[in-house]
Amino acid sequence: SQISLRGS
């Protein structure tokens, strides 16, 4: 599985 988190 793949989990990606992006914040700005």
UniProtKB/Swiss-Prot annotation:
GO terms for molecular function: aspartic-type endopeptidase activity. Disulfide bonds: none annotated. One of its GO terms (biological process) is proteolysis. Its main location: secreted. It is found in: Secreted, Extracellular space. The keyword Repeat does not apply. The keyword Glycoprotein applies. Glycosylated. Its EC number is 3.4.23.-. One of its GO terms (cellular component) is extracellular region. It is an enzyme of class 3 (hydrolase). Chorionic epithelium (trophectoderm) and placental cotyledons. Keywords: Aspartyl protease, Glycoprotein, Hydrolase, Protease, Secreted. Belongs to the peptidase A1 family. On the 2D-gel the determined pI of this protein is: 4.7, its MW is: 50 kDa. This is Pregnancy-associated glycoprotein 50F. It comes from Bison bonasus.
